[in-house]
Amino acid sequence: QLWHACGAFKKFGQRGTNMSIAADHAYHVQYNMVTVSSDRIRSIYADAFDIDVHKVKALGCPRTDAFYDEKLMDETKQKVYAAHPEFKDRYVIVYAPTFRDIGDDRTQFKPDLDFDKLSKDLLPNQIFVICPHPVMKNKIVEKSYDNIEVIRDFSTNDMMLVSDLLVTDYSSAIFEYALLRKPIAFYCYDLLNYNRGFYLNYPDDLPGDVYETQQ
C-alpha cells in the first residue's frame, strides 16, 4: 500500500475521531505491506491501520521523488505557466486546506475568509491560489477576483513548484513543501473545533506561524 500522505500529521485510518469514517477504513487491516517515509513513523502507521509493525517498511515516499528531479520540476512549472500565465512574475500564495470531518457533507468547504478583504489586502504583485482537497467539490469563491483563484487543473504538488508561500492548516502537504525550503504559514480558524487529533505536538512542532483569524 502506497499511502497518499507523507509523514504523520493529523490522525488517520482507524484512529480518526469520526467513527463512521474509521469504520469505512476497516479494509486497512488487509494490507500485506505499507511503505512510509521513515522509521520514526512506522509504529504510527501500524497503529492507524491495525497491522503488525513488521508489515510497515521505511522505503521512502514515492510522491516526493518529483522534488528531486530538477528537469521534471522545470517541465511542470512551464506547464503551469502555459495554462496560467498570470502566475508568472507574481508572488504566488498557495492555500491548501485539508477537508473537515465536521458536518454531513465533506464536499462543501467554506473557509472563514473574507475574500473581499483578502483581495484588497494583497499586494499588487501577489496572487492567492486555492488548491482544494480532492474531496471538496463546491465553488468555494463565489465572486471573481483578479488576484484570487481556485485551481483544479493542476495538483497541489504542481502548484507548490510555482509558489512562494504555502498556507495550510492540518494538511500533510507540509512534508512535501518542506523539501522546497519555502515558508509555510498555518491558517487554523477552527482549531478549537477541530477534533481529528494530531501526531505532532500542535502547534509547537509546526514549521511556521499559526494564525486563527484572518487579521
Language-model features, listed with the residues they occupy:
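Short, well-ordered beta-strand core segments
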Residues: Q1, V34, L166-V167, I184
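Short, solvent-exposed loop/turn segments at secondary-structure junctions
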Residues: A5-A8, D39-R42, P62-D65, T98-I102, ...
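Short active-site oxyanion
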Residues: V29-V34, I127-F128, V162-L165, G208-E212
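A short helix->loop->beta-strand "cap" motif at the edges of active sites that frequently abuts
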Residues: Y31-N32, D52-H54, P124-Q126, R181-P183
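Conserved catalytic-core segment of nucleotide-activated headgroup transferases in glycan assembly
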Residues: P62-E142
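Donor nucleotide-activated moiety binding/catalytic core segment of transferases
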Residues: P134-F175, L180
